[in-house]
């Protein structure tokens, strides 16, 4: 329906016809109000019809973006999980010793004048895990009366500790607050070029700072140069 058709319908419904004397119809406030109301409703219906396809398209776009974001998140989570599973936990003393030895060898060979480095690290034990605990203290006071009628109070103090556990699937695992690395008993570095006093002192200082061990636990010795056969 065009604008003129809509206008004619509204005019017939809400405007009074001509009077018997042929005079022009008089519009009251009621007619103006009713006309504006119907016109506003008509505009709302028309705008809703035109906007519905656009909203549907926007909803489809939002759904597609959300699905893509969810897929990307799952993929990233899977990558992190695979990387975590590939990391081998260090459960033995040998694992810690090998790790320290490889790290020291790699860094010491970058020092000027140092070559062909061999490292031996001796650790005290494996790592120490500190678990979260719930502590509770109890005080019990007992009134005692002896045969002579004397009274005395006896207070008994007791404390209990319980490791905090959390569910991990079908199992319960303790909550780890801190993991302490094992103490190091001694370090031996054998390399070419350490016969130079300054280079030797540099290696000792580097090892003591990296591993947090006193200098008297670090030994540095020159390596024998292999002769060509």
From Swiss-Prot:
Location of the protein in the cell: Cell membrane
Compositionally biased intervals (Basic and acidic residues): 71-93
Topology term for the membrane: Single-pass membrane protein
Annotated keywords: Cell membrane, Membrane, Sporulation, Transmembrane, Transmembrane helix
Disordered: annotated span: 64-93, 136-159
InterPro entries: Spore_III_AG (IPR014195)
GO biological process: sporulation resulting in formation of a cellular spore
Cellular compartments per GO CC: plasma membrane
Entry's transmembrane regions: 30-50
Domain of life of the organism encoding this protein: Bacteria
Name of the protein in its database record: Stage III sporulation protein AG
Organism: Bacillus subtilis (strain 168)
């Amino acid at each position: 329906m065009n604008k003129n058709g809509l206008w004619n319908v509204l005019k017939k419904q809400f405007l009074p016809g001509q009077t018997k004397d042929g005079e022009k119809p008089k519009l009251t406030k009621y007619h103006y109000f009713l006309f504006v109301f119907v016109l506003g409703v008509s505009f709302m219906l028309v705008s809703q019809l035109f906007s519905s396809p656009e909203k549907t398209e926007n909803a489809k776009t939002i759904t597609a973006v959300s699905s893509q974001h969810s897929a990307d998140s799952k993929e990233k989570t899977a990558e992190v999980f695979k990387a975590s599973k590939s990391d081998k936990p260090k459960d033995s003393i040998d694992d810690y010793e090998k790790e320290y030895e490889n790290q020291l060898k790699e860094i010491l060979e970058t020092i000027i004048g140092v070559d062909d480095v061999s490292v031996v690290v001796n650790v005290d034990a494996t790592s120490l895990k500190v678990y979260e605990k719930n502590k509770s203290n109890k005080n019990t006071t007992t009134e005692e009366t002896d045969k002579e009628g004397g009274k005395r109070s006896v207070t008994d103090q007791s404390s209990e500790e319980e490791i905090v556990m959390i569910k991990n699937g079908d199992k319960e695992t303790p909550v780890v607050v801190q993991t302490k690395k094992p103490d190091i008993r001694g370090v031996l570095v054998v390399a070419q070029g350490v016969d130079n006093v300054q280079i030797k002192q540099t290696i000792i200082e580097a090892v003591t700072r990296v591993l947090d061990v006193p200098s008297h636990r670090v030994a540095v010795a020159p390596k024998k140069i292999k002769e060509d056969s």
